[in-house]
Design a protein with these regions (language model features):
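Conserved ABC ATPase signature
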Residues: 143-147, 151
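Helix-to-loop junction immediately C-terminal to a conserved catalytic motif
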Residues: 66
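Catalytic Walker B motif of ABC-type/P-loop ATPase nucleotide-binding domains
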Residues: 168-171
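Conserved ABC ATPase "signature" region
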Residues: 121-139
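Conserved catalytic motifs of ABC-family nucleotide-binding domains
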Residues: 164
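Helix N-cap at the start of a conserved alpha-helix in ABC-type nucleotide-binding domains
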Residues: 179-181
Length: 252
């Protein structure tokens, strides 16, 4: 049954999608250029997928979009303003390897809601709703770090949703998961976007990208090589790096 997000989005009904833009962004480390004059825009599509070979800068781009790191050159804006504390809180980030407290599942969610200054009387109901969304009602009092990989990832996603984001960034959320766990994550992504939260997803899985993406941003060597609707990307990619990647020829 679809989850009712009204408890976390009651004050957001009039809020437009939060556009995020990277303009001439560069990042270097140890004399090596990781992101090179990157220009991209995350707009109104419900689900954007970032693809590209290893080392293309996909995970780094997610961190730039969320403000977890600052660029060496260029500008990151959200809602037309430079990324700062006030608009960063509208952008959630879930890492490939979940970072969970050494406490119970319930306590992890309680901690996230406390950070949003949610009153104790409201936290109880919200925790139950988040547990239901994640399918973890039966594991509420279990140690979070004792969950399976798929369960930990679902917990991380709903914990991020507790912060009422407009945009949720997911860094390879199904990497190393079995097909059943992958399906559960994809259902959760469906529910999240159905509720009006935009999802930006990094994946190497072309099948998953076909299932989930409205649009694809293809990165190559720290630059944006292609930004097209998903159907166009998979049927008739424009750039040579994208064509080579889909044909299995592009490794680096």
């Amino acid at each position: 049954m679809p989850f009712d997000f009204s408890f976390v989005r009651a004050d957001m009904s009039g809020r437009d999608c939060l556009p995020i833009e990277l303009s001439e962004v560069g990042v270097a480390k140890g004399g090596r250029t990781l992101i090179d004059d990157l220009n991209l825009s995350i707009g109104s599509g419900r689900r954007t997928v970032l693809m590209g070979p290893n080392g293309a800068g996909k995970s780094l781009t997610l961190r730039l979009l969320q403000g977890a790191i600052a660029p060496d050159t260029g500008v990151v804006t959200a809602g037309g303003r430079p990324l700062d504390a006030s608009n960063r809180k509208r952008i959630g980030l879930v890492l490939q390897r979940p970072i969970l407290l050494r406490r119970s599942v319930r306590a992890n969610l309680d901690h996230a809601l406390r950070a949003q200054r949610v009153a104790a009387s409201a936290r109880r109901d919200r925790i139950e709703e988040l547990l239901t969304l994640a399918g973890l009602e039966h594991r509420a009092d279990a140690p979070a770090r004792g969950l399976s990989g798929g369960e930990q990832q679902r917990l991380s996603i709903v914990r991020a949703l507790a912060a009422e984001p407009d945009v949720l960034l997911l860094d390879e959320p199904t990497a190393s998961l079995d097909p059943h766990a992958t399906q559960s994550i994809e259902r959760l992504i469906d529910q999240t976007t159905d509720a009006g939260v935009k999802v930006v997803l990094v994946t190497h899985d072309c099948g998953q990208a076909r299932r989930l993406a409205d649009e694809v941003l293809f990165l190559h060597q720290g630059r944006l090589a292609e930004h097209t609707p998903a159907a166009t990307f998979f049927e008739n990619p424009v750039s040579e790096p994208a064509r080579a990647y889909l044909a299995g020829r592009l490794v680096l």
